[in-house]
Design a protein with these regions (language model features):
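Acidic/His-rich, divalent-metal-binding segments that scaffold phosphate/diphosphate chemistry
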Residues: 1-106, 111
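Divalent metal-dependent catalytic cores for phosphoryl transfer on phosphate-bearing substrates
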Residues: 74-199
Length: 205
């Protein structure tokens, strides 16, 4: 476990004035939130990837909130709400991924064993909906917070409620929702993209 990352997340959650925060933190500690991967083989597919991804989403979301305000004059969302939805949007991934011996072909085409992650959730309840369910067991999410977490997958979610114009309706009325989705995409495909050589980009100028 990355103790510095845990301390950062706990401090951020405790900064939100919401009954049940301490109980929520106890749940995070009792689960594998701080050690779980963010996926089995894509972004954050390593120990601690889930917590790291959640912090990256928070950073991107705060940046979007500030930028939209300064550049477009849009009102800022409540910072406490941003902290909650960013750090809890993938709560559904706790107690879901487990290590197992897997097989793959090496560069010579020969089979080799390795230890990788497999998805074996203790509770099957969808993605965003499960995150909302778990969070609401400890704190009371507002309607906008719950909606933001529920729809954070955007068009990647194939659930029925996404196919009846509700996704666009939610984004058009709830800035917290589209900022969370955009921040999730930024964190996944930019900050956590191993194909982007940031050192080369940062030294070109």
């Amino acid at each position: 476990m990355n103790d510095n990352l845990r301390s950062f997340i706990v401090d951020k959650l405790k900064s939100v004035d919401r009954p049940g925060i301490d109980a929520l933190i106890e749940f995070l500690d009792s689960s594998d939130y701080f050690t779980a991967p963010a996926s089995t083989k894509y972004h954050g597919a390593y120990e601690g990837g889930l917590a790291e991804h959640s912090v990256n989403v928070l950073d991107c979301m705060l940046t979007l909130d500030e930028t939209f305000n300064k550049v477009y004059g849009m009102p800022k969302d409540d910072e406490g709400s941003i902290i909650l939805v960013a750090l809890l949007h993938d709560l559904c991934k706790t107690n879901t991924y487990h290590t197992k011996e897997l097989w793959r072909k090496d560069k010579n085409g020969k089979w080799e064993s390795y230890i990788g992650y497999v998805r074996e959730p203790e509770l099957c309840m969808g993605h965003g909906s499960k995150s909302v369910y778990l969070a609401n067991k400890y704190i009371n999410l507002s309607d906008t917070e719950a909606q933001a977490i529920l729809y954070h997958m955007g068009a990647y979610d194939v659930s029925d409620y996404m196919t009846h114009n509700e996704l666009g309706e939610a984004y058009s009325k709830n800035s917290l929702a589209y900022k969370l989705h955009a921040a999730d995409m930024m964190a996944t495909y930019v900050l956590e993209n191993e194909n982007i050589l940031w050192e080369e980009i940062n030294t070109e100028g």
